[in-house]
């Protein structure tokens, strides 16, 4: 049997500068959940009602499911269609960070929650029809044979589907609750923003190579898929937030991020401004300059603890 030749990646010869730009951004943003002092949120966690605690665990379990999908199936499914080896490398980084995100929710659970309650949330995630439905919609395109539809599905997952869950920790943070957990979620959101942007960029680059007619078909497909996901997400939001008065605010946040997902694909917004009007407190909590003082671009912040190496000389140790 003749083996195919393997080419070594050469980062000194790059055909698309965006690959290196995004690689540098992702690696400079690298973080781990162990560096965030989640235990500082234990007192705040204990002030939440039983309903709020259960909601939080279900939200984070749903997000874990989506991260698992993106880590195990999503990003790897995009690799065979990569145009450059550098694009493959970026996608491998994306896949790994999705595993870090999934690990992060387990860190929250082990720090704040009782095992029996977490187990109940995981059982809920396997039986919740809208949650399983959105994973199935995305997965069927990942397992398909159309590279551009895979990218559309990936952008909708990264830039839209996570946000019915992301709303809750931002809401708590805006009220001074679970602020360290919110810091961790901001790190995840920062990553997802880069992922959605990059995969959307690659989608648009690939569109340049096909006919106008095919572009029109893909645009129609994208809008139809988004509407299908949106209808399902409304049902998911209603079920998830049923015992709270927050569902309408979450739905506005969904519209806001659905429009952003379309922008990542190069398309115009679908939802009018009045449907996508997000509570300013939530947008402020999302900001890199929120109360937790996170620096989205260096990976540092009031809650993220990382040691720094400083060169010393022998005389520095003469106490």
Regions inferred by a protein language model and the residue ranges of each:
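Non-heme di-metal
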Residues: 1-319
């Amino acid at each position: 049997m003749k083996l195919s030749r393997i080419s070594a990646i050469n980062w000194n010869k790059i055909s698309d500068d965006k690959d290196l730009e995004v690689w540098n951004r992702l690696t400079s943003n690298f973080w781990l959940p162990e560096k965030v002092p989640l235990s500082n949120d234990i007192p705040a966690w204990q002030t939440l009602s039983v309903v709020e605690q259960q909601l939080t665990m279900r939200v984070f379990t749903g997000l874990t499911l989506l991260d698992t999908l993106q880590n195990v199936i999503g990003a790897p499914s995009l690799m065979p269609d990569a145009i450059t080896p550098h694009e493959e490398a970026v996608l491998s980084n994306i896949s790994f960070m999705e595993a870090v995100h999934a690990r992060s929710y387990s860190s929250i659970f082990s720090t704040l929650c009782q095992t029996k309650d977490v187990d109940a949330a995981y059982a809920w995630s396997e039986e919740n029809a809208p949650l399983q439905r959105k994973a199935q919609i995305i997965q069927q395109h990942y397992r398909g044979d159309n590279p551009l539809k895979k990218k559309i599905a990936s952008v909708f997952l990264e830039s839209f589907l996570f946000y019915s869950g992301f709303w809750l920790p931002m809401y708590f943070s805006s009220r001074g609750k679970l602020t360290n957990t919110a810091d961790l979620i901001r790190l995840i959101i920062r990553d997802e923003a880069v992922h959605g942007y990059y995969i959307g960029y690659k989608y648009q680059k690939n569109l340049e190579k096909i006919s106008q007619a095919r572009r029109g078909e893909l645009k129609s497909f994208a809008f139809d898929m988004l509407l299908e996901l949106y209808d399902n997400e409304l049902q998911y939001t209603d079920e998830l937030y049923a015992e709270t008065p927050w569902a309408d605010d979450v739905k506005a946040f969904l519209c806001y991020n659905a429009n952003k997902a379309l922008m990542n694909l190069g398309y115009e917004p679908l939802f009018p401004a009045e449907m996508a009007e997000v509570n300013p407190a939530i947008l402020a909590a999302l900001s890199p300059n929120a109360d937790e003082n996170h620096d989205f671009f260096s990976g540092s912040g009031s809650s993220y603890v990382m040691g720094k190496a400083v060169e010393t000389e022998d005389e520095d140790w003469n106490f």
